[in-house]
Amino acid sequence: MSRYDPAATESRWQAAWDAAGVFTARHDPARPKYYVLEMFPYPSGRIHMGHVRNYTMGDVVARQKAAAGFSVLHPMGWDAFGMPAENAAMERGGHPKDWTYGNIADMRAQMKPLGLSIDWSREFATCDPEYYGQQQAMFIDMMEAGLVYRKNAVVNWDPVDMTVLANEQVIDGKGWRSGAPVVRRELTQWFFRISDYAGELLEALDTLKDWPEKVRLMQANWIGQSRGLQFAFSTAGAPEGFDRLEVYTTRPDTLMGASFAAISPDHPLARHLERHDAEVAEFVAECRRVGTSEEALEKAEKKGFDTGLRVRHPFDTAWELPVYIANFILMDYGTGAIFGCPAHDQRDFEFATKYGLPIRPVFLPEGTEETALAEAFVPMKSERVHYIRGFAGAEVQSGEEGVAAAIDFCESQGVGRGVTNYRLRDWGISRQRYWGCPIPVIHCETCGVVPEAKENLPVRLPDDVSFDVPGNPLDRHPTWRDCTCPKCGAKARRETDTMDTFVDSSWYYARFTAPRAATPTDAEEADYWMNVDQYIGGIEHAILHLLYSRFFARAMQKTGHLPAKAIEPFNALFTQGMVTHEIYLTRDAAGRPVYHLPEDVTDGKLADGTPVEIIPSAKMSKSKKNVVDPMNIIRQFGADTARWFVMSDSPPERDVEWTASGAEAASKHLHRVWRLADEISRADGEANAEDGALDKATARAIAEVTQGVEGFAFNKAIAKLYEFTNTLSRSGAGAEAKKRAMRTMAQLMSPMVPHLAEEVWAMLGGEGLVAQAAWPKADPALLIDDTVTLPIQVNGKRRGEITVPKEMAASEVEKLVLADEAVQRALGGAAPKKLIVVPGRIVNVVI
């Protein structure tokens, strides 16, 4: 008997699929469509096991849907712009384009052996001029639609990458790629008006029923809707033109506990004082050395500068509050000014304590007396409290009721108005780097800011650039930078900023519907293929990428590039777990960890016998060397083993631990399936009474595997296939029944292990390719179970089981039980004292 050889067979079946055009997406109005998409990768140069798991999940869905009669779109591309390519050019020489396209070629060569059902004819990279040229066309359309504008803004500046970062790209006060501390700088920036859609983006989350609740909650919190009061303090001692200080507060019920007012370092009043006071200028400069994100400001030490100015309380003009410039106030949220109530905000409490300001409680827990506070009392807004310095509503009420009453009262007294605000700010997209999509704008002394003429698109990046010094090479490239105005023909300058790379990934799903179209999308193709039916990717993209994509779909709908139905581009979202691995380390003479690759460790030791410390499984990391190269697994076991293992060991939303023993077990099972198929293909037994039982088992396998795949419970589908393999190997059914069951097995396992499935299908005489075979359907009549399995207990101990027809009389069941070998051994020739048959449940034998 020959042996299963994945290395020899997998490439052969991949060639057969390609030759038959099996995975080419076809616009077929006669068939329902299904669009499955995994978040496309950054071309770093190597795929990892996380990629394998992610793309295998999508592949399982795509293959099953195709078999079920859908016209499937399952594309792949590359999120190819970004700083790593520029960093590589600076560190190693060469050009970002060469580095990027070289990595794409390497990763494509690593992905193809996995046997993914991808329509490679639709492949593109976001750094292709054909792609970013269409992005530039959309930018111009968005300018005309009023969705793009330019203004001076305080931004997060990464001094190492020498570029602007969005707030979301600042992690712990540092740049998300460089790790450098971020500073604040004022620059002229391009913005998308995403904040115009804040309410709509928030409300529409409720329609995304097939998204994880966690992701919807994260987006809702990021959009951050709040209801509050906007009002003005009158000022005392302020410069001319600053007789009022506009404030926004979400807790107007605490107005009677106010002890100070504070403004952002970027507030117009602070800017005015900065120009006339050296001490203010020094303090503001210090504030700007902290990033602009809320996270950065929250973690920084709270500092303030007493301006000497005062504001008058709106309900008592004799009550004056000092005005501070504070480093924790954001200019682009609310009005850039607040009042502080230290008793009910921990940040304000720390600030007031530091600067010796009064702390006046407004409300207390029910049933308590006023005492000096050791910390701020900040109950949930839904909690009922006792207002001791309230001015609206009941004496005892919830915070929510207190806020609503305070807004109503203040409006009735002419003190401000109720306002709904959002944390979500407009999306600053300007980046001072080369390897990104050029912003298609010309600066003309006569005409001002002018969009490039569409017939001149794409505005291509120049190839002859140098990375000898930090900064944006486009600023130093006069033949590219200097141009003529498309409106008047005079000398002009190109915009040298490029777009945030999140723009590139915010519409790629739409481009896949017609990747060679001469416009961003083709209306007919977009109408057929959109929306993405199943989107798959990591939870780390819950806010940035997914929120930006939702905004872009709306912008594309407004500018005529997507149909109205695609306003929410992703019908269903699945966030998969990570692939983890143990960490192996020894320590050097100084006690520092030295990490080792898994292949260098055997039985907890290195090749020289040195024992290693084993750290429990963690996310695979190149720095900690707990990585497994998928190509090594494919060479050793075959692609199907890698696919089977990452799908079988854990629910897909959870992490899966990669182990060598697990991979070996998966490989052994697949070899067992091949041997079983080989044996059945040569069987010649006659039809018999067991055929019906095998047909019923096959029907159950079809039903449960289908349910598992369609419900994203891939591990349960695989568990059923294990069980079906055991059933088939033990069955005494006739040859034709077993061949029929084995062909069904090939169809059911095809989404997970497509190469082995083709081998089995061909071995058992299946017609054509199993990849093109229709998904099997279970006969409903065979799913009705007319038998029951009864456990047999002898003196309370389980001794076996018996399967009988459900309607069998108890007397007939007793005869079969007494004939059972295990029962006979227990009886030892004696008659039982009692034999009790509980219909449909159990048989008890008492001796």
Swiss-Prot record:
Positions of short motif 'HIGH' region: 41-51
Coiled coil: none
PROSITE patterns documented for this protein: AA_TRNA_LIGASE_I (PS00178)
Location in or out of the cell: Cytoplasm
EC number, as in UniProt: 6.1.1.4
Gene Ontology MF: a single term: aminoacyl-tRNA deacylase activity
Residues reported to bind ATP: K622
Motif extent ('KMSKS' region): 619-623
Reaction equations catalysed: tRNA(Leu) + L-leucine + ATP = L-leucyl-tRNA(Leu) + AMP + diphosphate
First-listed, main subcellular location of the protein, grouped into a coarse class: cytoplasm
Keywords: Aminoacyl-tRNA synthetase, ATP-binding, Cytoplasm, Ligase, Nucleotide-binding, Protein biosynthesis
GO cellular component: cytosol
GO BP term (any one): leucyl-tRNA aminoacylation
UniProt similarity note: Belongs to the class-I aminoacyl-tRNA synthetase family.
Name of the featured protein: Leucine--tRNA ligase
Species this protein is from: Cereibacter sphaeroides (strain KD131 / KCTC 12085)
